[in-house]
Amino acid sequence: MVRGKTQMKRIENATSRQVTFSKRRNGLLKKAFELSVLCDAEVSLIIFSPKGKLYEFASSNMQDTIDRYLRHTKDRVSTKPVSEENMQHLKYEAANMMKKIEQLEASKRKLLGEGIGTCSIEELQQIEQQLEKSVKCIRARKTQVFKEQIEQLKQKEKALAAENEKLSEKWGSHESEVWSNKNQESTGRGDEESSPSSEVETQLFIGLPCSSRK
């Protein structure tokens, strides 16, 4: 019985698709192994199932094979000569860039009031609108900068006021301490002056008192 040829298109039935994937995957892994053994070739195979499951085979080390592949492709790209088509494309891009630069330079000169002698009414109106728009942007930015500076000055004022208050409190407590010390010294001197410090003179009389003498 002749086996029918399989049509190369996506299998719609999910179960049949999974069965076919398992069979073909095993066959592919087997072929990769046989190729590496029979031909002494470095073979690496990476397969992701429809559900994202990884299947891999490497005759040596998978990462080493990947690194070798990246080095090979990098060298191949770096040594690839620039084709005529790429050269023409680069020339076109360079010419287009120069044209844009010239247009920007001309627009800049017109905004500065230079080279407007040949401008039409429409072009002059367009330049005027651009200038008005620029002035509005500048004024808005200027207002914003003023607000930021005012806010910074307010914050600085608050910081200076707080520092001044701390210094005032510190100076007030120091002044009170000085006055307290002065009062204590004054009180001490007053007590010394008011206390009896004079010496008492005594005389020794021998005999009868004067009133009893005859």
Curated annotation (Swiss-Prot):
| Phenotype reported upon loss of the gene | Plants are late-flowering.
Which key words are in the record? Answer: Activator, Cytoplasm, Developmental protein, Differentiation, DNA-binding, Flowering, Nucleus, Transcription, Transcription regulation
Question: What InterPro entries does this protein's entry cite?
Answer: MADS-box/MEF2_TF, MEF2-like_N, TF_Kbox, TF_MADSbox, TF_MADSbox_sf
- Chief localization class? nucleus
Stated consequence of mutating residue 34 to K: In sso11; partial suppression of early flowering time mediated by SOC1 overexpression
Mark out the compositionally biased spans (Basic and acidic residues). Answer: 162-177
Q: What does this protein do?
A: Transcription activator active in flowering time control. May integrate signals from the photoperiod, vernalization and autonomous floral induction pathways. Can modulate class B and C homeotic genes expression. When associated with AGL24, mediates effect of gibberellins on flowering under short-day conditions, and regulates the expression of LEAFY (LFY), which links floral induction and floral development.
Its quaternary structure? Answer: Forms a heterodimer with AGL24 through MADS-box domain. Interacts with AGL15, AGL16 and AGL19. Interacts with OXS3 in the nucleus.
What is this protein's name?
A: MADS-box protein SOC1
| Originating gene | SOC1
